[in-house]
Amino acid sequence: MASEQSNPRLPRRPPYMAEKARATLKEAFPNTDDAIIRAVLAASGYKLEPAFNALLGLSDPQVAEEMEQAETSYAYDTAAHDDPVQRQLEEDERCARELANRYNSHRPERRRKTNNDRRNYPPQNRTAKPNDNDGDDYSFFEDDLPVIKDTFMRGFQSFKQRSMEWVENIASKFDGEEEDDDDEKYSAPSKIYPSPRRSTAATLESAYEERPPSLPRRKPSRPGTAITLPPYESDPHMLNEKDFERLRLESSSSPMMRRSSLNSNRRSVESSSSAAFVEGQSFILDSNGAIEVANSAFALDDSDLESAYNEELEMKKDTSKPTASTKEVVVEKKPDESRKQAARTLETVSEEQMGSSNAKSKVLTSEPKDSTSVEAEKTETDEPAVGKGASDVSDTAEISEKTEAKNADSEANLEEKSDVGEEKESKDENNKASLHKDVEEKDTKITNEDTGKTETDVKAKETDSIEANDKDEKTDSKETEDKVEETESKEADVKAKETDSIEVDDKEEKTDSKETADKVEQTDSKDTNEKPAKDDNKEANEKAEKVDSKDVKEKIEEAADLQNSGKET
């Protein structure tokens, strides 16, 4: 008894749901035994409603019969609903009723709309349909909309055909006007452009601005109309100064290749061949000796080149004897040095002509070709043509002497320049050596300064590290003192709790002893029921005492460890 009184009493546990249900059933059916109530609860899965119904059936047989009838009817209903065919029929019926309700709810609004539409718009001549007579089944989307769509498509197709015919008529008219313009252009070109002998770059640009060339004609879509090939390129454009800078004189195997190189390819070749002037063209010599084509506003097509070549062959066959009206002269072959000198003479001649005339450029026009010019082109000579006539050829000797003198002067100037360059190179080398020395001296100064800075930095870092260590030691000592104070306070708290727990245990033991004495005197029949509870209380008290003792020991050990660690620090 002393051990039982020493153990504290455990708190009461909250009742479970099963206990609550058992208590409610006991209140509802006080005459039934506890064993029956527990059995019914266990059979119903500890659910209150089915257990209540079962106990009610035990007490009242009429209620049991009613419950059986209700269960049989419910089972029949579930069996009927389980049939898939019956279920589908029921769902269809429900869906049909919902649709009928919706349709009937919107019927008056639909009738009002149809009546208003019929008042606003006049009656149309449309084919009668079976749905027109039924006022209730009338719908705009099913009856009127297809008719409107059909009429709209027919009107659109007719409009499309008319517009296509109108466009074709306009195109045919424009084709006829372009044919007339082409005929006028090829019949009388002198009205549009001036003669090649009097033409200049300014006049050509003004003529191009007044009437630019027409674009290439498109092929007609209908049979019967004339098909004409485009005489020019699809994208004509005016030539700039940059285009003329790349033009040079060259000698080629045929006049067709010469013309293609001058007009389309624009290849840059050494100016060492004779000037092959073509009929109808004019060339401009600028101050640099570069040749510009004055009337090459449009690029020639291959068909034009072939026609020109055929005309030259016919002229060659017709004319077998040379005439006196030629201005081109055939010059005998010379070595490579004579070619270069003759090429230089072109520049000198152009400068003299520019000085005499006080103009920026001089236009050299080519006369119609005779047999001598054709022979000159056929021989494929690489010698330059110095002038237009024999008088120009006689002056080439003097010009060549002048050029030789100029070349000698230029060589002397080059030698002087080479000497000056060597002197500059020697000066540059000396300057570089002095610069290298200055750079090395600066580097040595910088390295010395860096070493001094590094020493001062190392000293500063050492002092900083010492100060940081001192601060860390101070903070560690403060932390140890704080920990010791905390451990002391914890020990005091533990002692106070122990004393409080001892006093509480004494009080509880006294009260328990009094209560047990009263209970023993009052009820002897309850001893058998209270023995297992007391055993449970003893075990629980023993476990609680063990746990409390372990917790106290652990706290004491932790406090001792903290004290030891504080002493060590």
From Swiss-Prot:
Residues 347-364 have a biased composition (Polar residues). It comes from Schizosaccharomyces pombe (strain 972 / ATCC 24843). Keywords: Cytoplasm, Ubl conjugation pathway. It is found in: Cytoplasm. Pfam families: CUE. GO terms for molecular function: ubiquitin binding. GO terms for cellular component: cytoplasm. Residues 250-274 have a biased composition (Low complexity). Its main location: cytoplasm. Residues 67-139, 175-275, 311-569 are annotated as: Disordered. Residues 104-113 have a biased composition (Basic residues). InterPro entries: CUE, Cue5/Don1_CUE, UBA-like_sf. This is CUE domain-containing protein 5. Residues 79-100, 234-249, 329-340, 367-381, 399-500, 507-558 have a biased composition (Basic and acidic residues). GO terms for biological process: signal transduction. Residues 17-60 form the CUE domain.
